[in-house]
Amino acid sequence: MPASKSLPTALLGLALACPAMADAQSMELGQVLIGAEETSGEDQAVEDAKVRLDQVAGGTNLVDMRRPLQGKVASNQDVLAYQPGVYAQSAGNEGVKISIRGSGINRAPGAHASGLYTMLDGLPLTGPGGTPYELLEPLWLDHVEVLRGANGFDRGALALGGAVDYVSHTGYDAPRLQVRYATGSHGYQQRQISSGQVLGDFDYYLAVTDARSDGYQDHTASQSQGVIANFGYRFNPNLETRFYIRHRETENDLGGRVTKNSIEHTPRAANPAYVSRDDSRDQPGSTFIGNKTTYYIDDDSSIQTGLVYHDYPMDLREGPNRLKVAYSDVSGTFDYKRRDTLWGLESRSTVGLRVTKHLPNAGASERVRIPTGNTAGYAPGTPIRNFTYQGSDTVLHFGNDLEIADDLWLTTGLAAIYTRRESAVTYPQSGGKTSMNDWDYAPRLGLRYQLTPDLQLFGNLSRSVEAPHPWSLIYSSNIRFPAGSGVATGAQRDPVKLQNQTATTLELGGRGDSVIGEWSLAWYYAQVRHELLSVLPDANATTPYELNASPTVHQGVEASLQSNLWSAKDGGKLSLRQAYTFSDFHYRDDQRFGDNRLPGLPMHYYQGELRYDFPQGFFAAVNTQLVSKVAVDYANSYYADPYATFGATLGYNAPKGDWQTWLDMRNLTDKHYAATVTPGYDDKGLDAARSTPGEGMAMYVGVSWSLL
């Protein structure tokens, strides 16, 4: 598909030309996609986030939710659109596959995410078992901060993909009352009512949200409902605290993975096995309770502490057996920040501690749901196995930014990490147990140079560390209960040991403003050891194995450009925003696969939107997404096809900011394509069921009203 190569190439050329064309206009540095074209003076949280991200010696993104909310926003696919370096695609529900710099490259959509450290309002959401998605309700968000790769170091993030912080509204930036409703194709409906206010030294934000959809693919109906509340209090100018509460329930029918032939000819068809079993994935009620307290010692130093309780059970009916999973974590954080003078040079230091631990009840119970194979002859509900998931992550990190010359900052850092993982089969009694613990380290060295007010260059060399999930220790085992073990015959018996994944990454890049627009550009190269890769043993499997790979390479380019193409005398404006991600992930002389590409992600990923804003508040936009082919197995014997989709939006933002309406039209050509790929080992060139279909042509309409 020539277009999928020419547009990203043109974008990259423009971004490379930006330093030469930098003009003298003042600017705010950083990758920022703002919401409505006017910046609200009351949204100080977004402005503060821009300043923080400007000071990072590496690639970052800032998403102001005012822009995505001018269209359908149902999942992370909508929140993280048009973000360089971020791949986010949905399998038709909230279980979005997210990858940054190849993190969780072959994780299946709907599973707990890997390779990213995810936060809610700066507090840990990610636990030893990965990152659940059900609490990531987009309508609750004020903005999202993304620190790609090792650039999440000062947040305590040591994963390959970096850190993502979902920041919710508070009483300081929310309307006193807001009502939002959206509806559209495939039975989609979304409703929310929210309120936020500042009452003296106290403020609050409260929202109730629900959504439901029949789904594009057969047997992918979903529904959800949830509530969020946070309450803040300022005791005095030096001391403030905020409590956070989130609770949400989701139910998702599963259509399963299908073949390329099925997507081409019957794109809405589900995998027959999933339909016959009535497979589903329910989160019956996830709860997140946290507190963050900040004490400003003086104008130059502060201490912030955080505490979280996170309970997230699951009811998985994803095969012939039923798995009820209990997950509960507790987390604590401590951060000390200081700005002072070191050897006569301006210095900014951070010392942080992050601890997350599974509680003793974490584990799973597996029972017969549909008697078949080794469970034939046993009644539904018969216990098969009980097993435990235990783990903890402890990260102590120190970072410093030192201005060693005018506008030249040296970044140094060192983190120590202690990880513990344990899994045991407690029923039947002949089950095994595996326990692992490991100390590791992650240094960081970087430079950031403000060459002109409109041009910043940066580079860094960093190390990342990621431990396996406890569940992968049992599901990756090839040691099974022998014949004669009753209903447990053939089930994994002894958990296995896996090594921590580590990587050393070099990053170079820059960001700035020029005559062609606001731009960002980053190149990175990572040598990864013991990469934790997942593989489905066969096309009918529902749970992947996870294994340590031979050495791999992750390298790529991340570029964005936001341009004001034309301004009319009456105040109208024509703008273009573009994001391009080049990803080259491959083995290094693997004994079986040589230098094969790692499957699951495209090499080229481009998104662009051309938009005209009328002075009266109306807007109209057209958009496109171009994606190259994707390998579906480690042997690279078969590929999902490249594709291009096109869409358009129309809407109106009232000048007073009190109401808006929009029409979001997607995939106008009704293109049939694979949205996500969950890799197999070696399909020998056959068209195996590895892909989930992307949404066909669809239209959505929405309206919101606010009492300001």
Q: Residues of each region from the PLM?
A:
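Conserved C-terminal beta-signal and adjacent last beta-strands/turns
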Residues: 23, 445, 459, 504-506, ...
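N-terminal periplasmic accessory domains that precede
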Residues: 50-51, 76, 98-99, 116-119, ...
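Short acidic/polar hinge/loop motifs at secondary-structure boundaries
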Residues: 88, 108-109, 116, 121-148
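Transmembrane beta-barrel wall of Gram-negative outer-membrane proteins
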Residues: 176-178, 183-212, 217-255, 281-296, ...
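Membrane-embedded beta-barrel scaffold of Gram-negative outer-membrane proteins
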Residues: 197, 292, 296, 302-308, ...
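Gram-negative outer-membrane beta-barrel transporters
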Residues: 343, 404-406, 410, 418-419, ...
